[in-house]
């Protein structure tokens, strides 16, 4: 084993350096292309006349995979919920605390739809 390492140390080191450089280049490319991709998506919305999908009825499903282990909602899920209906902001303000954690009274709604009637049934709060 020592003979193998002695003979191939340079190649192993070169492979490690190559992987490190690849990761650095990949991260730099992602950083540079993300704003460009977002701009092109917005431009496509303008050209096609399309826009983000909006639901006609307020409500979303609060799934367990949208939450961390400590019941904190992921930022990307919150952004998605907020983008699909204007009333979702009120729903999220009611069911999440200041740390974006689902309040204990609403944890029984995980896996179900969140709308005005389920919030009223769970806590008595009228939205």
UniProtKB/Swiss-Prot annotation:
Q: Does the keyword Transmembrane apply?
A: no
Q: Which UniProt keywords apply?
A: Capsid inner membrane protein, Membrane, Virion
Coarse class of the primary localization is: virion
Cellular location of this protein?
Virion membrane
Q: Does the keyword Membrane apply?
A: yes
Instruction: Provide the Gene Ontology terms for cellular component.
Output: membrane; viral inner membrane; virion membrane
Q: What is this protein called?
A: Protein P6
Q: Which organism is it from?
A: Pseudoalteromonas phage PM2 (Bacteriophage PM2)
